[in-house]
A protein has these predicted regions:
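Active-site PLP attachment segment
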Residues: 301, 308, 314-349, 364
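Conserved core of the PLP fold type I
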Residues: 145-289, 300-318, 389, 471, ...
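Hydrophobic residues in well-ordered beta-strands that form the structural core
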Residues: 214, 235, 293-295, 369, ...
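Short, solvent-exposed loop/turn elements at beta->coil junctions and helix N-caps
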Residues: 327, 448-452
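Short glycine/serine/threonine/alanine-rich loop segments
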Residues: 49, 66, 231, 257, ...
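Short, conserved active-site loop motifs that form the nucleotide-linked donor/cofactor pocket
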Residues: 188, 291, 321, 409, ...
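N-terminal basic, amphipathic alpha-helical segments
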Residues: 1-146, 351, 355-362, 370-373, ...
Length: 505
């Protein structure tokens, strides 16, 4: 039944009130195309008005194209144009594309594409940044859930503090101590994944027109957040020891940045680990010029060889480092729990943003993760994950090596992390390669997606080895090589993508 409330003391005529009420319901979609309106006699009786008042109201709606008379059905909501459900003929729908912020429009959609590619039948994807779902300790978490106390079971249905579930903050503080970072639970905040920390840092420190310094090639998710904020990103060249800190100080003098963003350990996409000497030099420059450092460390515990290097936060002499990390890369992607360790004023400001954004992280996930850490399950799980990923890394490297002389690709074997950063000959026909890879049902991420300053490195591709099933790695490498050979046979020698094109193939 359609309910209409009339204001009989209003100066607006009753027929206009009736017409307006129906018009609002049709425009909002509450009344859909083909919905029958009450008969004139029934509506007049229900509203206590003359039938002529309803006749006049329906006449207004018909004249405006909102309703029409149909034989055998009476007055119904008019047919609509397109798929605009509730928008009658003659009424123009909003032109949404013209209303979007230009900054939001510049944001890429690589993550959605990655999810789509991974779901395509028969595709072997090296494009993702995902962990291996088969390594999730499902039985452990099921047992932890069964063994929750009555108090914990009740707490799952309650909100947690904005800064995070107190016991979990304490557990994270202990975990940070194992990484050499001195941070009390008050210095820790739980996040909905570490990428939320990137967003909060941008909203806290940056304004349109500001400058961020980062590695020349870096995490595309961070680049999208910075660029959507109207910020200019300046890339610092890298070598095998990480960011070229000999160029950093001059860049700080020249650009007066508001933030330095870095992934110093098993960097995404290069897999490079910044040397200890470079870390001290970076911190020294940041301290001298008063520039905060945002350290992103999602892969630091995934070491398969080499000697450990302390996080920047563990070496920080002046408290200028904001440290981000996550459990998503070592557990599973759907477990969107990350954390930040930072000085109290930063935690306070992030907490305000968290309260405005999503109040707090999912309470059941926080409780279960805390029990997982306190129960001593984290270290053995890490050992299992490291062993599996080391094996996958080596298998991919060996598979690619079989085609090295034929294709001319090359890479450095990283000591940890998720990725091989593979170079191709400078003359390589990259556009043809992307097309042939798609035809051969194999996926990767191309170098331009990671370019900080918009200067594409067209002869690079990033290959993820953690998510692809180990049994598919050999075949995936064969498909890549086949696509590369076909590209050289049929390619035009072009090395540049079209403007703005950053395909996943």
């Amino acid at each position: 039944m359609i309910r209409l409330d009339l204001e009989r003391e209003s100066t607006t005529p009753l027929f206009e009130q009736i017409a307006s009420a129906f018009r609002e319901r049709i425009m909002s979609g509450l009344l859909h195309e083909g919905t029958a309106l009450p008969t004139e006699r029934d509506l007049a009786k229900r509203l206590g008005v003359n039938r002529s008042t309803v006749v006049r109201a329906y006449g207004e709606l018909k004249a405006d194209g909102f309703v029409e008379a149909r034989v055998g059905r009476g007055t119904v909501v008019a047919a609509v144009e397109g798929e605009g459900g509730g928008i009658p003929r003659g009424v123009e729908p909003l032109e949404w594309d013209s209303l979007f912020s230009p900054d939001a429009g510049s944001c890429g959609d690589l993550f959605s594409e990655m999810m789509s590619v991974n779901g395509r039948e028969g595709v072997i994807s090296f494009a993702s940044g995902f962990p291996d779902p088969d390594l999730f300790p499902a039985e452990v978490f099921s047992g932890l859930e069964r063994d929750l106390s009555a108090a914990d079971r009740r707490a799952q249905f309650l909100p947690s503090p904005v800064e995070g579930f107190g016991p979990l903050r304490e557990s994270v503080s202990e975990l940070l101590s194992d990484r050499g970072i001195d941070a009390s639970s008050r210095d820790v905040m739980i996040l909905s994944g570490s990428q939320q920390g990137l967003d909060f840092a941008a909203r806290t420190f940056l304004s349109p027109g500001d400058i961020v310094l980062t590695e020349k090639s870096t995490f595309f998710g961070a680049l999208e957040i910075f660029r959507t904020s109207g910020v200019r990103v300046v890339g610092i060249p890298m070598d095998r020891d990480g960011m070229r800190t000999d160029l950093l100080e001059s860049a700080i003098r020249r650009h007066n940045p508001r933030l330095i963003y870095t992934l110093p350990t098993f960097q995404n996409p290069t897999g490079i680990t910044m040397s200890l000497e470079r870390r001290h030099e970076l911190l020294g420059a940041a301290s001298r010029f008063g520039v905060p450092v945002l350290e992103d460390d999602p892969y630091g515990e995934l070491r398969y060889g080499g000697s450990p290097v302390p996080p920047l936060k563990a070496l920080d002499p002046c408290g200028c480092v904001i440290y981000l990390s996550s459990f998503s890369k070592v557990l599973f992607l759907g477990f969107r729990v990350g954390f930040v360790a930072a000085p109290a004023p930063v935690i306070e400001r992030f907490s305000r943003l968290k309260q405005m954004t999503d109040l707090h992280v999912n309470t059941p996930a926080q409780i279960l993760l805390d029990r997982f850490l306190r129960g001593g399950h984290y270290a053995p799980h890490l050992d299992r994950v490291r062993a599996a990923y080391r094996r996958k890394r080596d298998r991919l490297s060996e598979a690619l090596s079989r085609y090295r002389s034929r294709i001319g690709w090359d890479w450095d074997l990283p000591d940890g992390g998720y990725y091989l950063w593979c170079s191709l000959p400078g003359f390589f026909p990259m556009r043809a390669f992307t097309a042939k890879s798609s035809e051969n049902r194999v996926a990767f991420l191309p170098g331009p997606a990671f370019c900080a300053d918009g200067t594409p490195r067209q002869n690079r591709i990033r290959l993820n080895f953690t998510h692809v099933p180990e049994t598919d790695i050999e075949e995936g490498a064969r498909r890549l090589a086949r696509a590369a050979e076909k590209a050289r046979e049929n390619g035009s020698g072009e090395t540049a993508f079209a403007d703005g094109q950053e395909p996943i193939v």
